[in-house]
Amino acid sequence: PSPRWASVPSGFHLLEIVGYPAPDMPTGAALESRPFMVGGYRWSIQVYPNGRFPEDADCIAVSFALIQDVEHPVKVHAGFSFIDEVEKQDPRHVRTIQITHVPGNCCMGFPRYITREAFEKSEHLKNDCFTIRCDLIIVQEGLQGVNARANAD
């Protein structure tokens, strides 16, 4: 039989940081994106230049948040990457979260996305600016066993 394709709610958002603030921000302080919609849900991205938790203060942390109340947790696959230029991803720092259930008003991510030292020496930081991309794919229960093609917004 021929493969069946289903549309999967998906999209991405870019958070551009202008003026790298690491020395001036305490651990646990975040830079947050404006809200954006993927799959009919409201999301945001957070970047913690000096880590989210004291034990990770030497790292940059990234997370995404479902910023609305929901009746049931949303099943989602998420990925983060640095964007050196719009539409050009660097695969060396791509991190993904496998399918997970996200309750409303909750965030998930990577407390140790990259060490601050490695980041500050990388090509991702240019003129004290960088961009993080967050890709979200909403997993719908009825698509099990069907080849699904993600349609980026």
What are these regions (language model features)?
Residues 1-153:
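Protein/peptide-recognition domains central to ubiquitin and immune signaling
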